[in-house]
């Protein structure tokens, strides 16, 4: 039986009513017209989720082949175009304090202020980035699947695991400060419930923290229905009606496209959507994948957790690369838009069932007594008895397998049938490809697709399994670097063929000019950094732009943290830029009136992107002061070791585990 180790400090007041009501929670019968009544052919202010559209779709919102538009549906708008109508397309001016410091002390960076910008967001730019043509791809043959599965296991190193119970997903380190999904922000029932049940730490009436208790309370019934019936409601005896109801359910729980403005050169403005996925979708993902994500941190997994630049990862890659002859770096174009459903279906239906154990029930948390005491105390305060389930007999394997299979099948169906809503209220569905960026498993599924396409190409080219296993593969989403024992000529021959094969077979586009086939270690590039004998380097010009043009409104304290973050992000490669960061830190710190430690505490969100995939950052890096140049150099000069599965979880192995695939074959 798998055991999850739950950090004590993750227990918060996020379960309130859901915990107290655990013993008397019931699943109500869904009324006959329950889902149909969410369509309101009335004025916009009167409809709940969507209304019927009374005008044609404008030509600039007509999608390309492979994307379905719901012409008759009108959703709520979240457009910010009017707020920025007087702004130039290049966006706002640089931070005044940073710009003044550069003019007075660092005039060599003035050109960088003119080169870079944070472009103005717009509804058109969001739709244009989403709107990419898709094409049908054929599934793998059974013979190819049989070769791919053991090779994928070789490189991912994921062992079979128990899934997590709905209640225990609360201990995943959720980020609750971001905007809640479309459904919660427009559901009258959820808003009314959240008004009374939101926790004290809620940061606003549109945030996940405001709706967390309402979500946990109501969606447990929905998840129960999915496990029992494969639908988020109790199905009728009419299968056609069930499909209609399910389609309506997907439409009322859409994924909202929010705006993210990327640092850009003024002749190539980049505004991208951020996919605000439904909270219940992410909750189901956590049930199925929490232990998997813990294992992805291990050394024998090819996903590059633990090799972060800030932890000396480039130094480790330099050391390893000495044993190899050639290196391949593939730069994918529009990866998240073009990743075919063929491979995501392969992930859900073929690979995932081989990794989920079904003979021990749900994973048990190792410090069970501490948590069950907390739950019981909360239940008692509500006057509701709560019976401990510590010694509950695990469900029969066949029964549990059906529940797990229903969860996987539903999630895979929703992944394909997800409805996307633009800021100006138009709704679309992808039909052949795409990985939404706002789900829990985005990075893992991207990595899986990346690895699978590579392995399929190696097989198709004619390499044997043993030759393929000689490679050392490092992947993070759509980024990759492959170390090979082959001659440079042999690797070039493969890559030239592979670029055409991926386009013909999967519709995936490789950016040839940004990819690299080399035998020179100093050309190895990982996550935006280039190797320089073990020290990472990158464009200082772009860092100047990022420092001067923050993505969102920032306070003086935020700018202090940003200055620290960019000092680390520059990796001590420029004394001048480090001095700029220090000046910026001193300028904004002087404008605050609180203790430095209080200013910096809890402001990790303002760190640059290199820190985002690194939840353990505070354990290895001091963020309570501005670092010296030597501090940064010392930090990067030595690899700090591979990550462990904790604090996410501890997953033991089994001698003869029974997986979901064994039960369903």
From Swiss-Prot:
Catalytic activity line of the entry: RNA(n) + a ribonucleoside 5'-triphosphate = RNA(n+1) + diphosphate
Record key words, sorted: Nucleotide-binding, Nucleotidyltransferase, RNA-directed RNA polymerase, Transferase, Viral RNA replication
GO annotation, biological process: DNA-templated transcription
SUPFAM superfamilies according to UniProt: DNA/RNA polymerases (SSF56672)
Major enzyme class: transferase
Known EC number: 2.7.7.48
GO molecular function: nucleotide binding; RNA binding; RNA-directed RNA polymerase activity
Keyword NAD assigned: no
Function, in words: RNA-dependent RNA polymerase which replicates the viral genome.
Protein name stated in the entry: RNA-directed RNA polymerase
Species: Atkinsonella hypoxylon virus (isolate 2H) (AhV)
């Amino acid at each position: 039986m798998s055991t999850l180790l739950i950090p004590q400090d993750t227990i918060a007041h996020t379960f309130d009513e859901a915990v107290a009501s655990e013993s008397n929670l019931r699943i109500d019968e869904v009324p006959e017209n329950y889902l149909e009544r969410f369509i309101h052919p009335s004025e916009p202010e009167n409809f709940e989720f969507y209304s019927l559209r009374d005008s044609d779709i404008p030509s600039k919102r007509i999608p390309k082949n492979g994307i379905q538009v719901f012409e008759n549906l009108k959703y709520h708008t979240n457009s910010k175009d009017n707020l920025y109508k007087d702004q130039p397309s290049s966006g706002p001016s640089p931070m005044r304090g940073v710009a003044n410091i550069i003019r007075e002390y660092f005039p060599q960076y003035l050109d960088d202020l003119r080169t870079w910008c944070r472009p103005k967001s717009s509804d058109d730019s969001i739709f244009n980035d989403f709107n990419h043509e898709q094409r049908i791809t054929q599934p793998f043959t059974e013979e190819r699947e049989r070769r791919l599965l053991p090779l994928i296991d070789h490189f991912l190193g994921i062992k079979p695991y128990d899934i997590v119970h709905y209640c225990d997903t609360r201990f995943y380190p959720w980020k609750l400060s971001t905007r809640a999904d479309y459904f919660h922000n427009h559901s009258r029932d959820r808003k009314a419930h959240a008004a009374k049940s939101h926790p004290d730490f809620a940061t606003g009436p549109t945030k996940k923290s405001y709706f967390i208790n309402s979500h946990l309370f109501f969606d447990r019934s929905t998840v129960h229905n999915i496990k029992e019936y494969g639908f988020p409601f109790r199905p009728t005896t009419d299968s056609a009606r069930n499909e209609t109801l399910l389609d309506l359910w997907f439409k009322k729980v859409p994924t909202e496209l929010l705006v993210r403005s990327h640092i850009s050169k003024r002749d190539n403005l980049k505004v991208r959507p951020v996919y605000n996925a439904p909270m219940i979708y992410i909750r189901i993902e956590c049930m199925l994948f929490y232990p998997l994500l813990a294992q992805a941190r291990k050394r024998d997994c090819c996903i590059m957790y633990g090799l972060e630049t800030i932890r000396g990862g480039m130094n480790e890659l330099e050391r390893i690369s000495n044993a190899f002859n050639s290196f391949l770096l593939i730069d994918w174009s529009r990866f998240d838009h073009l990743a075919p459903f063929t491979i995501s279906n392969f992930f859900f239906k073929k690979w995932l069932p081989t990794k989920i154990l079904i003979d021990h029930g749900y994973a048990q948390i190792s410090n069970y007594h501490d948590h069950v005491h907390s739950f019981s105390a909360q239940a008692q305060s509500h006057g509701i008895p709560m019976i401990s389930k510590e010694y509950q007999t695990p469900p029969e394997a066949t029964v549990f397998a059906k529940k797990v299979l229903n969860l996987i099948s539903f999630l895979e169906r929703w992944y394909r049938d997800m409805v996307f809503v633009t800021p100006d209220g138009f709704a679309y569905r992808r039909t052949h490809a795409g990985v939404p960026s706002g789900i829990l498993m985005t990075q893992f599924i991207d990595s899986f697709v990346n690895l699978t396409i590579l392995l399929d190409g190696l097989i198709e080219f004619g390499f044997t399994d043993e030759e393929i296993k000689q490679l050392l593969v490092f992947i993070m989403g759509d980024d990759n670097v492959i170390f090979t024992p082959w001659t440079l000529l042999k690797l070039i021959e493969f890559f030239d063929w592979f670029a055409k094969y991926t386009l013909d077979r999967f519709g995936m586009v490789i950016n040839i000019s940004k990819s690299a086939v080399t035998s020179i270690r100093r050309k190895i590039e990982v996550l935006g950094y280039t190797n320089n004998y073990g020290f990472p380097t990158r464009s200082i010009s772009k860092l100047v732009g990022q420092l001067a043009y923050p993505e969102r409104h920032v306070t003086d304290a935020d700018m202090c943290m940003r200055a620290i973050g960019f000092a680390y992000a520059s990796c001590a490669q420029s004394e001048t830029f480090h001095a700029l960061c220090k000046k910026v830190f001193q300028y904004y710190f002087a404008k605050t009136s609180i203790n430095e430690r209080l200013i910096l505490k809890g402001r990790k969100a303002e760190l640059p992107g290199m820190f985002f995939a690194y939840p353990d950052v505070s354990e290895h890096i001091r963020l309570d002061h501005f670092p010296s140049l030597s501090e940064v150099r010392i930090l990067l000069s030595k690899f700090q070791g591979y990550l462990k599965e904790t604090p996410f979880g501890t997953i033991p192995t089994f001698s003869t585990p029974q997986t979901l695939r064994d039960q369903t074959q």
